[in-house]
């Protein structure tokens, strides 16, 4: 994506894939530095552990927001039930570049369960929104971002419309 999509460095769609027992794969310990990883899971189950002592489970609808800053080593692996039983895995991971002044900040980890992520619907009931980061429909997310980011999971019924006001210099990814 490069300079044209700054601050976004990468967008990875994980799946959708259905794993048989014992087949699910993840990412064993590996380093990151100078950016944030935002993982949003739709199906399946993952577990996180890192060199800063953070750990957490990621279930459908949950968000993991890891700020690597000056550097962190972490792993993202299937939860035990995914390895034992198999199942459907689907989610997204976005890498967000940190501004130069923040690249050496201390690493941090935010694990936000689906139940803590605000949801709302449009007045006509045709648009459902989960406000992961930023603001939509006058609902503000609970996540603390280093740079202003808006991430909204939308479900729209037939005939629905939604307009989101954006500042003129915003980079946008629509999935």
Model-found features: residue ranges?
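A short glycine-rich, His/Asp/Glu-containing loop-to-beta-strand
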Residues: 1-42, 120-163
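A short beta-strand-loop-beta hairpin characteristic of the jelly-roll/cupin
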Residues: 39-60, 75
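Tight coil/turn sites that cap or link beta-strands
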Residues: 61, 69, 157-159
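Ligand-binding loop in jelly-roll beta-barrel domains
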Residues: 68-101
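Long amphipathic alpha-helical segments that form oligomerization/scaffold cores
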Residues: 93-129
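Conserved small/polar residues in nucleotide/adenosyl-binding loops
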Residues: 173-175
């Amino acid at each position: 994506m490069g300079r044209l999509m700054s601050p976004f460095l990468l967008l990875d769609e994980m799946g959708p894939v259905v794993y048989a027992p014992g087949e699910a794969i993840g990412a064993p310990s590996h380093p990151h530095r100078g950016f944030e990883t935002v993982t949003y899971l739709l199906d399946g189950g993952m577990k996180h552990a890192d060199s800063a002592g953070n750990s957490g489970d990621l279930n459908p609808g949950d968000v993991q927001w890891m700020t690597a800053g000056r550097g962190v080593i972490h792993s993202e692996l299937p939860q035990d039930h995914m390895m034992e039983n198999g199942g459907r895995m689907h989610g997204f991971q976005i890498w967000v570049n940190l501004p130069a002044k923040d690249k050496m900040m201390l690493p941090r980890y935010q694990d936000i369960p689906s139940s803590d992520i605000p949801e709302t619907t449009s007045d006509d009931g045709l648009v459902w929104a989960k406000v992961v980061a930023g603001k939509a429909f006058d609902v503000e997310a609970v996540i603390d971002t280093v740079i202003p980011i808006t991430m909204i999971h939308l479900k729209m019924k037939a005939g629905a419309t939604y307009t989101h006001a954006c500042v003129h210099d915003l980079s946008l990814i629509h999935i």
